[in-house]
Regions:
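Helical "lid/coupling" subdomains associated with nucleotide-phosphate turnover
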Residues: 10-25, 29-45, 51, 55-186
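Short acidic, Gly/Ser-rich segments with clustered Asp/Glu that frequently serve as metal-coordination loops
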Residues: 4-8
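Short glycine-aspartate micro-motif
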Residues: 1
Length: 186
């Protein structure tokens, strides 16, 4: 789960959480890097540049000039993506290290699933696959019904939606005694 303020690493085995760790750095660190690298002096503008023009791989980026909002300055998109890729590599390598610490890194036969706002970075799955040697895909939430369904399909909300679906399943389960209450009936 590539969040703004942290990265959550979970390893599942046989449908159960086998390993769970949270790294205290997230994708918002990229905003600060862009802010510093290009002397923007406004983290919000840096975040907007990242969201609009950012990518995970410099090699995939077609170089062009990008105007920094509300200024007369331009930067090269290659330079912007270089800053973003450098930080993403650091963050992803930290997540990979945590997966290795779980003791079952080599057994990730089903690959790695990404979620969270950071999973929306163009090419993030290619970068993570390259760094980890595992297949990488994106988590999806099924059967979401809401007034604004399109916005709920964003990976930013997947953790919350997953928890809500689990809660819904728990509510639907019958609460009467379970199998043991019928064990002694004649």
């Amino acid at each position: 789960d590539l969040g703004a303020d942290s990265i959550k690493v979970q390893v599942f085995q046989d449908g159960l959480v086998y390993f769970d760790e949270e790294l205290p750095l997230g994708c918002s660190t990229i905003d600060g890097d862009i802010n510093t690298a290009f002397s923007i002096n406004d983290v919000e503008k840096a975040r907007k540049l990242k969201e609009e023009f950012g990518m995970a791989l410099r090699a995939s980026c077609k170089n062009r000039k990008i105007m920094i909002p509300d200024t007369k300055y331009c930067i090269d998109s290659h330079d912007l993506v270089h800053v973003e890729q450098s930080r993403l590599e650091e963050l992803l390598e930290g997540a990979i290290f945590q997966m290795q610490e779980s003791g079952c890194y080599e057994d990730l036969d089903d690959g790695i699933l990404l979620t969270g706002g950071g999973s929306q970075v163009v090419g993030i799955e290619v970068l993570l696959s390259k760094l980890s040697g595992h297949s990488v895909g994106f988590a999806k939430v099924a059967s979401v019904k809401a007034d604004r369904e399109a916005s709920l399909k964003s990976p930013v909300y997947f953790t919350a939606l997953g928890l809500l679906q689990c809660e819904r399943r728990e509510v639907k389960k019958p609460k009467s005694g379970g199998w043991f209450s019928n064990f002694f009936k004649e």
